[in-house]
C-alpha cells in the first residue's frame, strides 16, 4: 500500500465502505457503528477489544496506544486495541474525556462457534450513565439531565444513576 492510500484509509469511515468489501468480522463492527455513529465502538475479538477506522484513530490519540492496521494491501484498516482485562481502565479514560462508548461482546465461546463468532452490543457507557464505582469520583455527583418542552413551558428531570437520586 502506498503512503497516499495508507493516509486515506486512516481518515476513512467504516460506514463509507460497501459491506461486501469487508470481512464478516468487520461487517459486525460496521453494523454496530451504523446504528451508533456517536459512539466509539469497542469490539471484543478474542483477548482484545478492538476499534477500527475513525474509532481506532481517536482511541490511539486519546488513550496513547499504538495505531496499527488489520488486513493486507487496499483492505488495510486502521486498528487500535486493548487487552480485555484492561477494559475498565481504558473505558474510564474515555468516559472522563466525554466519549460515549459502545461495548460489543462475544456472545458465544469462540472454541464452540461454528464459523463467525456471534457478537452483540451489550451496553453503551456515557459520562452520565456510568455506575461502576471504580470509574466514578467518590465525592462527586454524576448527574444526567433530561429536558422536555411542551406548549406552555418545559420540564426537567435530573438523576444520578450511581446513587439512585432523582429530581424533577
Kindly give the residue locations of the regions a language model identified:
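Basic, polar low-complexity surface loops/patches
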Residues: 1-168
